[in-house]
């Protein structure tokens, strides 16, 4: 209703991630952009590391809305999708996975033994391309690796990823 009335222009156009709560449920989603087309497929429930939903407002305030997590979510765990012209935000399990992958790379002692790299193997499921892309981006930006290769198993997926995540 509010989007149709143009409420997401002006000040609200600067908000990157919205969090909405009622007594029973909390969802977060990226700003849908100037056209205000909200897609419920991109409304996510916050979950803990074990993917158990978090809905209590006190837990939401101490996790999702806390600093540094709110800053990390907006700064590191969103992707500007050039193909659609929208901002995408990661689901909780994607956030935890990308963060854990980046942590393993940063904490590993690469100069000990015969380690020269590694790989991440994803199985079929929702969000693996964004998770692997963000993991690669976090590792590359942290300078914890000399080179990061983003390899896909299909030409179409590589092309799609390049178009979506080029920014």
Residue ranges of each PLM-predicted region?
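Conserved residues at beta->alpha junctions
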Residues: 152
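ATP-dependent helicase/translocase motor core
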Residues: 1-147, 156-167
